[in-house]
């Protein structure tokens, strides 16, 4: 699994695999210096203003950069809502053999195939389509496309949606998603990205309620009381529970977690072996200050 970070000089950027930067008025020397400093990272260059990119002929900066430093690893990112001139910029990048993708949240198969046909280097999979990762990831990978997700936000289209039936990834389930997801990008405040990254990549667990690190999750459910098979069952379930299917596994996981909590137990494997929990609740802000500052 690779971890992405939106550029913030207060963070330990070296601990991430990918850095997202916003393209503003940088000169060639500025870009070259940044790329040399983080030459072992993949750089995502976010184009905030397509009209300005065309008017300033900024493509020439990167043509020079590519010619002199073909070893640099980078792609372009176009803002989702910057409709003015976006198609023209995409065509320009395509004609000059630069990789790119758009900040579109891909939530169904039609959007996914449009991203494939448009030649995206990456796709951001969200909402219900995340419950088909087992099926769609091999397709996207066959086209050389990176699969990106936001693991730390409860994803649903409506506020009254069921939290546990929404898409998110527990810290304990990272290994399950690794064959299907290439890049984790974190939702939330820029200065907390490193805290989230440490939860998913170092701790790989969270002792406390899910709503302390899964943004938008309202229920008081402790992730470490959920059966270890939780993530695996959701990889390709297709959210059949919302289509008239009989699957009620997510509800069952919640009921079981409630029972385990009452008895201060944690399940450690599929054979239902349990151990006594020594849990202490942890707050994301406390974790942030303790581990980052």
Residue ranges of model-derived segments:
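Active-site pocket-lining/capping segments in soluble small-molecule metabolic enzymes
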Residues: 1-111, 118-293
């Amino acid at each position: 699994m690779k971890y992405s970070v939106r550029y913030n000089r207060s963070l330990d950027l070296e601990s991430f695999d990918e850095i997202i930067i916003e393209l503003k008025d940088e000169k060639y020397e500025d870009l070259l210096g940044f790329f040399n400093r983080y030459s072992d990272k993949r750089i995502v260059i976010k184009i905030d203003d397509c009209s300005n990119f065309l008017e300033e002929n900024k493509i020439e900066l990167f043509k020079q950069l590519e010619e002199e430093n073909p070893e640099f690893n980078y792609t372009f990112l176009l803002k989702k809502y910057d409709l003015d001139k976006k198609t023209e910029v995409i065509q320009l990048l395509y004609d000059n053999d630069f990789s790119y993708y758009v900040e579109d949240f891909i939530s169904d198969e039609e959007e996914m195939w449009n991203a494939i046909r448009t030649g995206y280097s990456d796709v951001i999979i969200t909402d219900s389509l995340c419950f088909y990762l087992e099926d769609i990831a091999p397709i996207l990978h066959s086209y050389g496309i990176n699969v990106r997700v936001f693991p730390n936000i409860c994803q649903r289209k409506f506020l009254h949606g069921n939290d546990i039936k929404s898409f998110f990834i527990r810290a304990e389930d990272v290994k399950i998603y690794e064959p299907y997801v290439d890049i984790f990008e974190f939702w939330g405040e820029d200065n907390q990205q490193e805290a989230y990254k440490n939860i998913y990549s170092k701790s790989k667990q969270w002792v406390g309620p899910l709503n302390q690190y899964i943004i938008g999750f309202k229920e008081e459910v402790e992730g470490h009381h959920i059966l270890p098979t939780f993530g695996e069952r959701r990889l390709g379930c297709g959210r059949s529970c919302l289509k008239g299917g009989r699957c009620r596994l997510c509800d069952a996981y919640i009921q079981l977690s409630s029972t385990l909590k009452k008895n201060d137990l944690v399940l450690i494997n599929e054979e239902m072996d349990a151990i006594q929990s020594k849990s202490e609740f942890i707050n994301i802000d406390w974790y942030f200050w303790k581990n980052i500052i």
